[in-house]
Design a protein with these regions (language model features):
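Active-site residues of response regulator receiver
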Residues: 11, 55, 83
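Two-component/phosphorelay signaling modules centered on CheY-like receiver
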Residues: 14-32, 46
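Acidic, metal-coordinating helix/loop segments flanking the phosphotransfer/catalytic sites
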Residues: 33-51
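Receiver (REC) domain active-site loop signature in two-component systems and cognate sites
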Residues: 58
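A Lys-centered signature of the CheY-like receiver
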Residues: 97, 105, 148
Length: 162
C-alpha cells in the first residue's frame, strides 16, 4: 500500500476493538477504533475513511442503523457488518441496505483481511472514478471551450435561463 488506507472500526466490545485494531494495523492500515455508534457517526461527518467495520448489535444504535446513515451521507464507503448472532436472514437484510460484506464472530483473520482488502480496492476505485469524472468535467465544460470573459458568462447565464 502506497498510502495507508483508513479503516474505522465500530464495536461496543473493547476486546474486539483491540483485536481488530492490532490485526489491521499489523496489515498496514491506519485504524481508528470507536466503541460508541453516535461518536462514530459524528466522526464520519468530519473525517475521511476508506472502509467502515461495524458490529451489528450495539446499545443506542444498531449496525444496520449505522449502515443506513453512512449510505445516506457517503454511499461509496464500503461497510462490513460483523456479528456474533449471524443468520442468513440478517445477512440478506444488511446486504439489501448496501453492506459490502457480512462477517460472523468469531472470524478467521484471513477471511477478514481479504474482505477488508477487497473493500479498500472498491473504495480506491470509487475515488479514482470521482477524480477522473471531475477532470473530465473541468476539461470539457463549456466555459473552458467558449471562454471566461464577463460578456461570455452573461451570455451563458441567459442561455441557461432559457
Amino acid at each position: 500500500m502506497s498510502e495507508k488506507s483508513r479503516i474505522l472500526i465500530l464495536d461496543d466490545e473493547k476486546n474486539y476493538l483491540l483485536v481488530l485494531e492490532a490485526l489491521l494495523s499489523d496489515a498496514g492500515y491506519d485504524v481508528t477504533p470507536i466503541n460508541d455508534p453516535e461518536m462514530a457517526v459524528s466522526y464520519l461527518e468530519e473525517a475521511e475513511v476508506d472502509v467502515v467495520i461495524t458490529d451489528m448489535k450495539m446499545p443506542k444504535m444498531s449496525g444496520l442503523d449505522v449502515l443506513q446513515q453512512i449510505k445516506r451521507s457517503s454511499p461509496s464507503i464500503p461497510v462490513l457488518i460483523m456479528t456474533a448472532f449471524g443468520s442468513i436472514e440478517s445477512a440478506v437484510e444488511v446486504m439489501k441496505y448496501g453492506a459490502f460484506d457480512y462477517i460472523t464472530k468469531p472470524f478467521a483473520n484471513d477471511e477478514l483481511l481479504l474482505s477488508v482488502h477487497n473493500a479498500v480496492e472498491l473504495s480506491r476505485a470509487h475515488q479514482q472514478y470521482r477524480i477522473l469524472q471531475e477532470s473530465l468535467e473541468e476539461r470539457y465544460s463549456t466555459h473552458q471551450i467558449i471562454g471566461k470573459s464577463p460578456a461570455m458568462r452573461e451570455t451563458l447565464s441567459i442561455v441557461d435561463r432559457v
